[in-house]
């Protein structure tokens, strides 16, 4: 499935960059609260990743990177989640997702399910390698695939719909 979509590459000197990043940080405050109503909803659906993927693909890697770096920290400070010990790994994984999504959209200038699948797989691989470097293990990355596959599908389909229709 290919869609004609408006994709942007916003720069750091544009107010829109920070406006959209702030909107995505707020979304990343609200969405996890909804998913945490479902038992293990945060682990299964990884709601922060959905917002970062859609935001970075639609508005560029800079918007995605700002939101990826700010969202886990703001969430932790306001809600206590994610736990402090997983904050560095989660932030790294979200940053890899933002960079991969933004650069892919910038290069291909279109949104397809196949491209989004590739983005998620590359981001999971680089995030897993980062987790290995930071913690010495890749348990959470393996969990992302074994428990979190519904969330990976939601990210791909959700980002596709956001990028295509918004």
For each of these PLM feature ranges, what is it?
Residues 65-70, 158:
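Short hydrophobic alpha-helical segments that form membrane-spanning helices or hydrophobic packing faces
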Residues 55-56, 105:
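Helix-capping/transition residues at the boundaries of transmembrane alpha-helices
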Residues 2-55, 62-63:
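Hydrophobic transmembrane alpha-helices
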Residues 50-51, 71-75, 94-101:
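Hydrophobic alpha-helical segments within and immediately flanking transmembrane helices
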């Amino acid at each position: 499935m290919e869609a004609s979509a408006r994709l942007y590459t916003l720069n750091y000197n544009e107010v829109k960059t920070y406006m959209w990043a702030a909107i995505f940080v707020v979304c990343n405050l609200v969405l996890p609260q909804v998913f945490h109503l479902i038992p293990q909803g945060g682990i299964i659906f990884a709601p922060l990743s959905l917002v970062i993927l859609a935001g970075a693909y639609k508005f560029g890697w800079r918007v995605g990177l700002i939101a990826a770096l700010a969202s886990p920290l703001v969430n932790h400070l306001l809600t206590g989640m994610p736990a402090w010990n997983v904050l560095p790994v989660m932030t790294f994984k979200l940053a890899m997702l933002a960079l991969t999504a933004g650069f892919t959209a910038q290069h291909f200038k279109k949104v397809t399910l196949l491209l989004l699948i590739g983005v998620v797989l590359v981001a999971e691989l680089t995030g897993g390698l980062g987790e290995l470097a930071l913690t010495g293990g890749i348990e959470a990355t393996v969990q992302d695939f074994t428990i979190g596959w519904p969330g990976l599908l939601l990210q791909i389909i959700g980002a596709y719909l956001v990028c295509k229709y918004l």
